[in-house]
């Protein structure tokens, strides 16, 4: 995929990166930033109808402050996003357009971020397979949005190495990572740890609990399991089932409109992750024998 994007980027005017509005930083792929750094970028915060509106505004302002970058939010219910996407791309590359110089746009995104659904909406037909299980998109395809506007699709790409632990949990909570790749109980505990600090009223309303902010994560998960009837023999809570309930309620926005990171938080996580990763790489290099 890296090779395919590298080849295509040479003849691309604008790169659209589709992000999950509930976790914009974590759903961005650092490899794309590296490969496309010289190209104008349109960041599309998809699923904004599931995200915290105030935090979406923070992220849009953050991306719009970056050079050569525009950002817009999209709702899943939006039926005519093509006009907004085309207009934003023309703002970024005003020198392109018309039959002699058609706009060439690359669209990228991690698995399950809603890229296939968006492409289907843009084209008005089932051009791409859709579903809610993280998976592999077919090979690159060209989609004509207007007589002078070509959109090139790419397979969904996850981080080559997830160096930010919190991002790994957020990606798993959102459904970007296949079920076999993570422990649901761990993910639910991380999710609850954040939600009880930032979205306590939503948790309390949904699960009919009080003072969740002061509860330990394991106690909170157990209390939710009991409230939701996730019980097994001996009237014990089935923590696996309770974890599945919490993750499902987040994904389906049953807990309300939630965003799992702000630009400031993500910046801190990334800085810490890069530091740890640099130390790890240095140790790894030290262990390798010197070449003669």
Give the role of each language-model region.
Residues 105-124, 128-130, 154:
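Glycine-rich phosphate-binding P-loop
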Residues 19:
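Glycine-rich, N-terminal phosphate-binding loop of Rossmann-like dinucleotide-binding domains
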Residues 81, 114, 150:
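Short phosphate-engaging motifs
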Residues 89-96, 111, 122-126, 134, ...:
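Short, well-ordered alpha-helical segments in soluble proteins
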Residues 60, 116, 221:
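Generic structural marker for isolated residues within well-ordered, non-membrane alpha-helices
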Residues 1-14, 22-23, 28-41, 48, ...:
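Helix-rich effector regions associated with P-loop NTPase G domains
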Residues 84, 88, 117, 190, ...:
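Alpha-helical scaffold segments in soluble metabolic enzymes
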Residues 42, 48-109, 127, 229-231, ...:
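Canonical P-loop GTPase G-domain recognition
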């Amino acid at each position: 995929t890296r090779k395919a994007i590298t080849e295509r980027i040479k003849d691309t005017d604008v790169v659209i990166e589709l992000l999950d509005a509930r976790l914009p930083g974590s759903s961005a792929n650092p490899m794309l930033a590296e490969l496309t750094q010289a190209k104008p970028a349109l960041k599309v915060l998809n699923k904004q109808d599931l995200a915290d509106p105030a935090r979406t505004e923070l992220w849009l302002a953050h991306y719009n402050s970056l050079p050569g970058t525009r950002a817009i939010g999209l709702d899943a219910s939006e039926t005519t996003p093509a006009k907004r996407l085309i207009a934003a791309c023309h703002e970024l590359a005003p020198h392109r357009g018309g039959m002699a110089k058609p706009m060439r746009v690359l669209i990228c995104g991690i698995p399950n971020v809603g890229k296939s659904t968006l492409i289907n909406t843009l084209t008005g037909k089932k051009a791409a397979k859709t579903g809610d299980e993280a998976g592999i998109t077919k090979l690159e395809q060209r989609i004509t949005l207007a007589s002078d506007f070509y959109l090139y699709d790419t397979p969904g790409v996850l981080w080559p190495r997830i160096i930010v632990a919190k991002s790994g949990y957020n990606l798993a909570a959102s459904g970007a990572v296949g079920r076999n790749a993570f422990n649901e109980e761990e993910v639910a505990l991380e999710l609850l740890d954040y939600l009880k600090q930032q979205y306590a009223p939503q948790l309390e309303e949904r699960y009919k609990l009080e003072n969740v902010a002061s509860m330990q994560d394991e106690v909170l998960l157990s209390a939710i399991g009991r409230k939701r009837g996730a019980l097994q023999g001996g009237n014990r809570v089935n923590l696996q089932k309770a974890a599945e309930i919490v993750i499902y309620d987040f994904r389906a926005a049953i807990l309300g409109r939630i965003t799992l990171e702000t630009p400031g938080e993500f910046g801190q996580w990334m800085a810490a992750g890069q530091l740890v990763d640099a130390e790890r790489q240095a140790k790894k290099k030290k262990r390798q024998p010197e070449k003669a």
